[in-house]
Amino acid sequence: MWRLKVGAESVGEEDEKWVKSVSNHLGRQVWEFCADAAADTPHQLLQIQNARNHFHHNRFHRKQSSDLFLAIQYEKEIAKGAKGGAVKVKEGEEVGKEAVKSTLERALGFYSAVQTRDGNWASDLGGPLFLLPGLVIALHVTGVLNSVLSKHHRVEMCRYLYNHQNEDGGWGLHIEGTSTMFGSALNYVALRLLGEDADGGDGGAMTKARAWILERGGATAITSWGKLWLSVLGVYEWSGNNPLPPEFWLLPYSLPFHPGRMWCHCRMVYLPMSYLYGKRFVGPITPKVLSLRQELYTIPYHEIDWNKSRNTCAKEDLYYPHPKMQDILWGSIYHVYEPLFTRWPGKRLREKALQAAMKHIHYEDENSRYICLGPVNKVLNMLCCWVEDPYSDAFKLHLQRVHDYLWVAEDGMRMQGYNGSQLWDTAFSIQAIVATKLVDSYAPTLRKAHDFVKDSQIQEDCPGDPNVWFRHIHKGAWPLSTRDHGWLISDCTAEGLKASLMLSKLPSTMVGEPLEKNRLCDAVNVLLSLQNDNGGFASYELTRSYPWLELINPAETFGDIVIDYPYVECTAATMEALTLFKKLHPGHRTKEIDTAIGKAANFLEKMQRADGSWYGCWGVCFTYAGWFGIKGLVAAGRTYNSCLAIRKACEFLLSKELPGGGWGESYLSCQNKVYTNLEGNKPHLVNTAWVLMALIEAGQGERDPAPLHRAARLLMNSQLENGDFVQQEIMGVFNKNCMITYAAYRNIFPIWALGEYCHRVLTE
């Protein structure tokens, strides 16, 4: 049976040397297979098999797992926290305050039971389907696939890939997406490397997958990221890639297209890609690689026109088509520049550029304890370290962090989009629990969560000259996941600060000692340093270049990736945090804070669309951004009566209410930038909770509470008997077009919204 190990228990004595930490591994989460049959009860084993069977049977209709393995592991704790049967409110029946409190008590009973001993909440952060294949290819090429991934890991990975294969035989960019060449070719290759036969899988799954690929022209039509991975494996030629010259890292920073000016995820992915491209690295040409060369293409491998293939992309993948200017640019570099730097004397500059790239790779690895910014650059950096020296400590240190990214549930094992969302979920959870006013009953839960937030704050800046490594100040910030990860994010810092400030208002005998004021001030300092001239806040750093740089975005699959844009969500979260800080600590940098909030409010108003909506870049989508937009403006002192933007936002959200109450927004809203209901006009608990809180914040209860009552009824009626809430469609997004699961949202936001509803809308 699989068991989740968290924190220090996730590191064995023999691994301690190779798993670096600045926080005693706080928040680390690793799934391990327990081979001790005596540790598993027949009841648990039956539950696991039933969960797997149920997911597989419904896989084409319900793409999200419900993290049932985690619930089975915490079964005893959940039973202890049980508070009786769920309350159901009939249509037309008045929602009573006691009924809401009863629902909240059951919800918190369940949610407290699944809190880890470290104080955070572990949950699935999967969804993208292009991550696992990159890991499998890298481990295969370096010859460590079967030593890093046990037989049980490989079985679960195959289960996951088969479970998320679409009915047409292909795979999407993410688990709810339609089939793409990027997803289909890479996942087909991953299954072959994991040991599946070319005609294996139930119901001819591999045959169907191959047919999907070949019917659309074969793997030459894969996206640029896919071309790189296939080149590394040896089933695609480097001459079929558009150039990724590492010499970009030698250019002066004053140039607007210097990599240091790009969004950190963009530069950190293209950094190792440029190293591999500059090296033209290819793994061992094995019989399986030779077989894949035959399986993936419609013509013999040696007859493929690789130059033509550079700009070939399947129509199913083409979210961001290359502008003509970009094709001319890459063509010029390909035909003129690259030949000069692959032979003497230009090769000397290429070697210098490769050395510079590796210095940046090693800096990123060491500064993140080999977790790295995200899963893509994690695997690419690991591969680069092996290419540089297969026996290096750097490569060994990387291998020990692979499992930080793996998550298993009833649908199988995936690679997550980060090493978790531990801090993010915990900061939200604290605010949700505080909103219920059931603090007395759940003080131990809050105390553990409080400790986690305090210990997760980044307490030092990155070493060395930040200008050399293109880093922002970090001291006082919070990450999305763990302190060991080490990368600040603006809205994570804001939510961490808000949670800390809220708990500072409660008795320390209940929730622990508050965070020291100097550390609160450090967080404020980081937030103030992140505001752009237009008043908005980007995600990780200041916006360092111009939107026109998107013209050279080479990733056909993703939008708006080249620079770090200011976001509605990051801006609004920061406004809330600064407002609360000013209220509790009025003497610290008050004038600067007031100025920052005023500029941010103006930014939010400018970002609002004509119909009253805001486009959400990190959640689905208009409901998510609407919640943040309204909260941010209210934090700035605006009201429904005084602010046209708030009135328009409320009108927009109310216009999207479903006939039976609630809201249900599809991920297609993100992709197409047009509000789109879920298929069948189904309501979604998380969208409904976001809108319920947004409308409460804007004073809807004083004008017409009927939509609020309908939303609350929907949330209450969706609670399961054990206090959990049902897992529905995907709610996270990045880069406009790729979705990501935040499994804890199904608990956090219904609890938070019902808490706000209970105490701000209902009367005694």
Swiss-Prot record:
InterPro entries: SQ_cyclase_C, SQ_cyclase_N, Squalene_cyclase, Terpene_synthase_CS, Terpenoid_cyclase/PrenylTrfase. The keyword Repeat applies. Keywords: Isomerase, Repeat. GO terms for molecular function: cucurbitadienol synthase activity. One of its GO terms (cellular component) is lipid droplet. Its EC number is 5.4.99.33. PFTB repeats lie at residues 104-146, 154-195, 520-565, 597-637, 646-687. It catalyses: (S)-2,3-epoxysqualene = cucurbitadienol. The active site is at D491. Changing I489V: No change of product-specificity. No change of product-specificity. Changing L488P: No change of product-specificity. No change of product-specificity. One of its GO terms (biological process) is triterpenoid biosynthetic process. Oxidosqualene cyclase involved in the biosynthesis of the highly oxygenated tetracyclic triterpenes cucurbitacins. Converts oxidosqualene to cucurbitadienol and does not produce lanosterol. Belongs to the terpene cyclase/mutase family. This is Cucurbitadienol synthase. It comes from Cucurbita pepo.
